[in-house]
From Swiss-Prot:
The lineage of its organism: Eukaryota, Rhodophyta, Bangiophyceae, Bangiales, Bangiaceae. Contains two covalently linked bilin chromophores. CDD domains: PC_PEC_beta. It is found in: Plastid, Chloroplast thylakoid membrane. InterPro entries: Globin-like_sf, Phycobilisome_asu/bsu, Phycobilisome_asu/bsu_sf, Phycocyanin_b. Its main location: plastid. Keywords: Antenna complex, Bile pigment, Chloroplast, Chromophore, Electron transport, Membrane, Methylation, Photosynthesis, Phycobilisome, Plastid, Thylakoid, Transport. One of its GO terms (biological process) is photosynthesis. NCBIfam families: phycocy_beta (TIGR01339). The modification N4-methylasparagine is found at residue 72. It is a peripheral membrane protein. It comes from the Eukaryota. This is C-phycocyanin beta chain.
Amino acid sequence: MLDAFAKVVAQADARGEFLSNTQLDALSSMVAEGNKRLDVVNKINSNASAIVTNSARALFAEQPQLIQPGGNAYTSRRMAACLRDMEIVLRYVSYAMIAGDSSVLDDRCLNGLRETYQALGTPGSSVSVAVQKMKEASVALANDLTGITQGDCSALIAELGSYFDRAAVSVV
């Protein structure tokens, strides 16, 4: 965002002019959009533990074999690893959301994740379901406009959903 401000200022300075009303309006819109983005990420971050825990509970209710003897989330060590991985995905989705770009999610979280899970024998389809459940919870929080900067958030919510979809697809 600072790059956009610096670019507009540099352009006006090169022309020896004040910023135009059009430029100021565009920058103001960008700030308002950034505030909404921050509000959405803050809601996710503030509720991260509940998002992960409730999504895991819902996954295990649907797929109880995961927590039975021999299941991939059986034993407290494996359960902790599952919850940790879910939290990592949620964290990187929040990074992508704040940046407005999936590259941090792709580069630092998703690239190679499918292969890692395959090597560990972790069912990618179950991980994908867990990610979708976190998406549902996060989108529901984002749709609650309490504490969100006024304005249409539909594009941001769609963007948020797309990051979860990207993560869900990458593990199967």
